[in-house]
Every structure is written in C-alpha cells, then in structure tokens.
Amino acid sequence: MSRYVQRPENALKRANEFIDVGKKARALDTLQEVFRAKKWNYNWSESIIEPVMFKYLDLCVELKKSHIAKEGLFQYRNMFQLVNVGSLENVIRGYLKMAEERTEQAQQQSSQATVDIDDLDNLATPESILMSAVCGEDAQDRSDRTILLPWVKFLWESYCQCLELLKVNSHCETLYHDIARMAFQFCLKYNRKMEFRKLCEKLRKHLEDICKVSSQTANVTISKPETQQLNLETRLHQLDSAIQMELWLEAYKAIEDIHGLMQLSKKTPLPKTMALYYTKLAMVFWKAGNQLFHASALLKLFQLSRDMKKNVTAEEIQRMTTHVLIATLAIPLPSAHPEFDRFIETDKSPMEKAQRLAFLLGLQQSPSRALLLKELIRLNVLQLAAPQFRHLYQLLEVEFDPLNLCDQVQKIVDEIEADPNSVYGQYIQALKDVTLVRLVRQISQVYQTIEFPRLLELAKFADYHHLERILVDCVRHNDMQITIDHRNECVHFGTDLSESQREDHPDGPTLQSMPSEQIRSQLVNMSVVLHRAIATINPNRKKAERERLRAQMVHQYEENADKEHQRILQRQKKIEDRKEYIERMNQEREEEELRLQEEQVRMQKLAEQRRLEAENEERERKRHENELQMMKERNMKEKIEQIKQTATGQKLLKKLDEEEIRKLNTEEIAAREAEERLKERKAHENNLKTQEKKIDYFERAKRLEEIPLIEKYLQDRSVQDKEFWEKQEAARIEAAIAERKNAEACQERLKRMLPDRDVYWQQLKNERGNQFAEKLKQFNQALEEERKRRLADRVVKRREERRMKWLKEKEEERRRIEEELRKQKEEADRIERERRAEERRIQDEKNRQLAEKQLAIAEEVERRRREELEQMKEADGRRERRPAAGPAEPKPEESWRKGPAAAAPANPAADEPKKNVWQGSGRYGPGPRERGGETGPKDKWRTGPEDHEKDGGGAGGMRRGGDMRRGQDDRGPIRRGGGEERGEREDRGPIRRGGGPGDAPAGTGTPRRDDRPGGWFNRDRRDDRRDDRRDDRRDDRRGDDRGPRGGGERGNTWRRGPADNADDNRRGPRDEGRQDTWRNTRQDAAPKQKEDRPQREARPAQENVPPRSNAGPDEEGWTDVKHR
C-alpha cells in the first residue's frame, strides 16, 4: 500500500483506471487511502469530495464491504455535518438506495434460479432430493440462502451503521427517523423478526441516550417539540410494523414508549394520533388475551371519537357502541379469589401489572367488568347499540331464564356468524363461555341436583368435555359449590351448607340466595329484623335523638359562626394570594425560559462562527504542513521502492509500521536491511543443521523399531478378525433360522383360531346386549330404592353420630382429668424420692467426714505414744548406765500420756517397736506374720503399751479424757475409766476404723470391724462413692504429705523434717548436696543413707485407700505422715 496520500481527484481518476481493468479491490484501496489519511485536508470542498465518496460507496456495495463503508461515512460526517448537511444526506440516501437495489436484484436472481430447470419432466433431480433430505429445505430456500441472504445481511448492516452515524446529531435528525422507517419496511419485506427486535432495542437505547442531559449544543434534545413529534411518529410506525409481523411483545414495548413520549410532551397529542393509539392498544390487549383492558381501550376510543370527531354519523356511532358493548359482555366473569394469581406469577404482582396497563389507558385505577357496565349505562351506550345486542345484554345481565338462555344467545351468535366480514366474530367464543357460566350460576339457584345430559341439553353450544371444564372453572374462579358425580351422571350444587367463602354478591341476575349464603347471613338478617322491631316499638326514640343532635348542632353553629366566617374569609384571601403568586412565578419562569432560549441561540451562533473561523485557520495551516509532508514522503517513497525490489527489504518493511518508517531516514533503513539479511542467513543455516540431524536420527531409529512390531500386529489382527467374523456369522444364521421357524408355527396356529374367534365374538356381543338392557333397568330401580334407603339411613346415622360425639367428648374429659391426677401423683412421688436421696447423701457425707476426722486424731495419738515410748526407753538406758552409788533417779511423775506406774507393761520388750528395720504393714508386701508367724506389732493407735492390762483396771492408758476424741456421731463414750468402771468397749461402732489383724490387742485374735467383708467402710468406698468421688481420692493421694516414695509403702508412718525453705516440702528426689528430710519412724536415730535404703515396691492399684492425715510438726520440727 502506498504511503503517499494523493489528492481526491487524482485518487478518483486512478480508481477508475483500476475499475476499467477489473481490479475493484485495488480501486477501493486507492480511495480508502484518501479517507484514512491522518492529516486530512479539510480545505477541500464537497464538490470535490462528494464524487469520490459516491464512487467509494459504490465499490463498497459492489464488494459487500460494509465495515469499510462505515469508516468512510464517519469521516464524511465529521467534515460536512455542520457545513453542508444536504451533501451528507445525499451521500447516505444514495448509499442505502444502492444497497436496496442490489438486494432486490439478488432476490430476483434467486427466484429465477429455481425456475431455470433443464428437464421439465424430471423436476426432482437426485441432487435436489439429496439436498432436501440433508438440510430440510426446498430449492427456493437454498437459493435464497446462497444468493439473497448475503445481500440482506449487507443491507441490514448498512441501516444499523447509518443509524449509529446520525443518532445524536440534531442537524440530521429527520434523516435519522427516515432511515429508521426504512429499516422497519426492510424487516417487513424480508420477514426478519430477529432483526426487528434488535432494531427496536437499538432505537430504545438511542432514545435513552438523548434523554440524558448533554452539554454539547449540536446534540439532539428531547425537550424540543419537533424532536418529540418525530420520535412519536417513528414509534407509531414501529407499533404498526410489530402488529403486522405479530410480534406482540415488541408492540407492547412500543406502546410504552409512545405513552412515555406523550406524557413527556407539554402539548396534547392530536385526536388522530390518540385514536390510532387506542386502536392499536386494543388490538394488542386482545392478542394478549386481556379482554378487560381490550374493552377499556375500545371505550376510551369511543369517548374520544364522540367528543373530538365532529362529522360522525349515526351508523358509525352505532357500530362503535355495538363493538364496545360486545367487547364488554365478552369479558370473563371476575374471579372470586384473585389472590391465587400471586402463586402463579413470577416477576411482578397482578396488581402492579394491572396498574401499569391502566396507566397506559390514562386511568387512575384498574378497571373491572362491573365498572365498565356502569360506564356503558352512564354514557348511554346501550341505547345507541344495535337492538339485538341490547337484547344480549338483557339476557346476560338482567333477565333470569336459564332454560332459554342458550337458545336466545345462539340466535344472536348465528347472526354474527352470518356476516363473514363482521368484526364481532372474534368475540363469539368468549360470549359462549360467559353464557355457560351464567347458565351454571342460574341453574345452581334453581336446582340442587341436575342430570348431566339435561345440563348438556340446556347448554346448546357446549360438548361434554367443554362443559365439564366450565364447571371446574366455576368452582376454581367463581367460588361455586359444584360436585360432578360421574357414576350417576349428575351435578350437585351447594351441597356443603357449612362453607361459604364469597361475601360479595355476584353480579348478574339472581333468583335467590344459595342455602350456604342464607346460613352465613342468618345473624345479619336477624339484626336487621331486630332493629326494625325496636323502631316499631319505640318510634319516638330516634326522633328525639335527632332533635337533640339538631339542637346541639345549632348551638355549636351559633358559638362558632363568627370564627368560621373569619376562617373562610382568610382561606379565600390565601387562595387569591396563592393564585397571584403562581401567576407571577409562571410569568417569571416563562420570561426566564425565553431569555435562556435567546441566550442559547445567540451562544450557538457565536460558537458556530468561532468554530468556522477556527476550521478555516486549521485548514490553511494543515495545507502548508501537508505540502511539506508530501515532498518528504515523495522522496521516502522513491527510496522505499528501491528497497522493495529485494525479498529482505520487503520483510523489513513488513515489520515496520508507518510511524517508524516516517521517523527513519534512508541510511538507517539500509543499515537495518543489511542487519536483517545477516540474521536471516545465520538463522537459516542453524535451522538446516538442526533439522538435518534431527530428521536423520529420528526417522532411522523409528523405522528400524516399528518394522517387526507392525508385521506382528498385522498378522495377529488378521487371525483375530477372521475368527470373530466366523463366530458372529454362525450365530446370526442360527438365530435367524430359529426365529423363522417359530414365526411360521405361530402364524399357522393363529390362522386356525381366526374363524372361531369371529363366531364367538358375534355370539357374545348379541347375548350381552339383551342382558345389559335388562340389568340397566334393574339397576335404575335399585338405584331409586337405594337412594330412599340411604336418605333414611343418613338421618339415623347423623343422629347417632351426634350422640356418639357427645359421649366421646365426655369420655375424653374423664380421661383428661384422670391423666392430670396421675401426673400430679407421679410428680409428688418423684419429689419425695429426690428428698430421701438427698438426705441419704448428706448423711453419708457426714459419716465420711467424721471417719476422716477420727482417723486423723488416731494417727496423732499414735505418733505421740511412740515418741513417749522412745523417751522412756532412753531414760531407762541412762539409769542402767549410771553407777550404783549415784543418786537415785527421781520417779517420773504421772501424766495423762503414761498413766500411773503400776500400769507399766509387764513385757516391754514385746511391745517395744523394732529399730532400724523397715516393717511393712502386710498390705503391699509380706509382713512379720507371713514371714515367720510372729505376732504383729502392737503399736497401732488403737492399742497402746498398756492395752494388755485393760482388764486389770489400770488407769494409766494413753487415752485423753474429755471431748477431745469424741465425734458428733459416736455411739458411746470413747474414754473409759480404770478398774472396774471401764467395762466393755463400746467404741466399736460402724464409724470407727483401724488397721489390719495386727492391730488387735495381744492375746486376742479378733479382727478389726473395718476389715470384715462387707463392712460399712468398704461398702461406703466401693458402692456409695461414684465417679465424682474418684477425683477427691485422686486429690488426696496427690497431697504434699505422702512422703518421698509417693505412697509406695502404705501402712507406714513417715516423718518429715523441718524445711529450710518452701521447696524442701516437695516430694520426689532431692538435688545433689542436699539432705533428704524424710524419715521412717521405724528406723533408728541414725538412718541409713539414701543409697542403702531398700528398693521401693511398686504400688498396686487399689481404690479403697483412705486419705492420709497430717498431725502437724512436733517440737523438733518433724511431721508424721500416715499412709494407707
């Protein structure tokens, strides 16, 4: 493509030369360069550019280049839309005319292609038959698709481009609407429904765009009356085209647009326009199945014609009134349950839709059938209509004659059908349906039950299924109680007396109320009669009340007369002031609008003048620049033509765009050409080497490997295919033979039975006919008898049902009272059980706490007793080591710990605990009894050193007197006196606890009470303590007073020394260099080292371990800890 921009006349001359030699595409490119130039020469006049533009568009039409034509049209519009609008209009109209002519020629050519048939005797050639079977089209359709459709598409694109080109330009507004109407005619002519929808959407989008406020003065403004009128006329053409194409949705949208434009206009539309609007609107409503709004539109048309049309004739008035009357009578009766429609509608509620439709008709509220009939009476439509249709109104809305209703209506329908050109034929089916509904409603007021054949006889123009459908719709929409008995072929009306859902009185003739309606309104009627009776008994009461109210009103008027008079005067004054203010504001607003319009016109003229001056200056400047640029480009063109002679130069130029070429000089272009040539040569050599190696190795290896595999695969596949075919063929032959034999045998067997079947069927048919007639007669007689019997039984049954219902209610009341008493008793028992369980729990908790307290006291006594024994032994040893001549030791005084001297043990060695020996309790390891049969230790807290002399009456026991050891639940005194007063021990109650068998006094083998099986202690710890007690035992076992071995030697008493700090009281191993402060009371004064102590035994699992107790530190800081 040449980079040199030619002058328009030169380009046109060169294009004609290309056309002469048959190169139309080159001619179009030459003309396109003129319009594609970025430095456009605006100083050229339309006389020079217009011929170029016509030739350019002619070539675009010839080559079907609609997008290229669009580009040129946009450039031409930018040049002449403000300078010479006539030239732009001529160009666009010429372009569309050329496209339409070529489309018509293509249509004629397509029609001629189907006529030119070589052989008239053989119209359906094999090729045409195959094509129709493949694509489902005939020859004409295929011809249109190949010849006509491309030109139709081109014409459609041309219309769309022109509309987009002129949509916002106020100077071309008339041309825009003319093209829109041409597009409507195009859609009608070629039946392009989809394109018509797109065109409507495009026009609606353009209207929305011009409705927006625009700051540009040349744009279209919707506030202008001319613009509104043009848009209104275009929408009326759109509505007419949509109705002709039967696109009712687009017609409805067009009606909405028309109504919006009429509302936007300040002027009242012309009566002719409104008449056309109402006519089209009535047609759209009828096609949509909305008879109510169809009749409303016809009524509005009648009112408009009567008020605005001056020379209307009587025949025309009669025709219009008759049309309105028939359309109103054809409206279906209103539904008693319009709220049911809400469950069917999906997008908007019926009320909103009805309000929108009423808004299109200029109504304040939605119309109804009753309101339209009242409006007909008010406007004297009935008297102006034809006599036969006035009689139709009397039959359907006034008279009550169900037996002759359908006959009378059928006569009127026959008159309508007799005229084939009558416009009332479309209402015949709707009138029949309304008549059937009226018939059913009137029949229901006369009969309670009617036979279905009789009802069909009354409904002359309805068959069985249609009448059944009418009955179902009456129940669904008109709230009628109807039951169809298919077995008895009858219809029941108003059988449910307890149900009445419709409160408003149905319109139309009514003879009497239904029984359910009478039952429902019984109280209302009683109230009316009672009020009448009161008025008859006391007639002066209401009169006196009226006199009193009249006197009160006169008194209030006399008091407020002056005030009301002044208020009315003030109101009149305010109204006058308000009117004057509104008039003044309107005058000021009109003056302001007039001033603004004049200012706007002046500013537009001034802006237009400035724009023209600026454009002239810009043209002069660009003309000089273009001349210099053309000289430079001429030189560059010569250099580029030289480079184009080589292949490398052509590739280089393809890589560079126009901007880069314009920036480079000839030397730079030559350097780039050499560089590109070198790169291309190196790349080509590398590619050749790489491809040579790759192809050589790959092909050679592939063929060597695939040869044996392919041969083996082919051999195996041939063998398999042959075996498979043989098996399938043998199986198919066997199956076909077997099926053939079976079919022949079955055919022979059935042929023999055919005559017998015919004879038997005829004989059976004759016999059953007589039997059926006799049985039918008997059935009817039995049916009548059964009906009478069931009526009598129903009376007895209902009486019995009422009695049984009363008895059932009594029985249910008795059961309910018994059930309440039972529940109250169960609730009282439950409360009592909970109270007893709570008492037991509290008692068990007290017993447990008392046992723990006594155990702690016993351990404290045991510890102190052992300390005293050790002190006594040490004192005896010191006395033995002293010399005989020394002074005698003073006799130790009696104390509450030791008792009198006479109470000393006879065998102290037997009671003295062993030293430096760890003695197990026998609970977790072998004790003294198990190892050698020795007697267990006597130093438990139950038995002191003097316990073997308890029977002797000694008073020196280790027990403390008073209430120190007494628990709140002890059964007897814990302390016993000496001598004879001690008596039997009574402290062996269920709440005392002790050790094992070794804890019994010497010489007695009686085990302790708490070691017996099933004792209260074991029972308490195993049965009464649940899961919530395990946490308490676990916390007791985790105390800080369990000794260094963590309770591994239960039954022993450990001594904890004084702690240097808080950390010394912790259990577990001590750090190196620190002394262990824990000691066993059975060890001697010099305990073994930590490493010489015996190995700890593993603690066996035991749940019934009582909690330990800490008796507190002694005078040396040591604390005894008893482990169980």
UniProtKB/Swiss-Prot annotation:
Keywords: Coiled coil, Cytoplasm, Initiation factor, Protein biosynthesis, RNA-binding
Coiled-coil residues: 96-124
GO annotations of cellular component type: eukaryotic 43S preinitiation complex; eukaryotic 48S preinitiation complex; eukaryotic translation initiation factor 3 complex, eIF3e; eukaryotic translation initiation factor 3 complex, eIF3m; multi-eIF complex
Subcellular location: Cytoplasm
Keyword RNA-binding appears in the UniProt entry: yes
Name of a matching Pfam family: eIF3a_PCI_TPR-like
Ranges annotated as biased composition (Basic and acidic residues): 812-851, 860-883, 928-952, 960-990, 1007-1048, 1063-1100
Swiss-Prot/TrEMBL GO biological process terms: formation of cytoplasmic translation initiation complex; translation reinitiation
Biased composition (Low complexity): 900-910
Subunit structure: Component of the eukaryotic translation initiation factor 3 (eIF-3) complex.
Identification of the protein by name: Eukaryotic translation initiation factor 3 subunit A
Source species: Anopheles gambiae (African malaria mosquito)
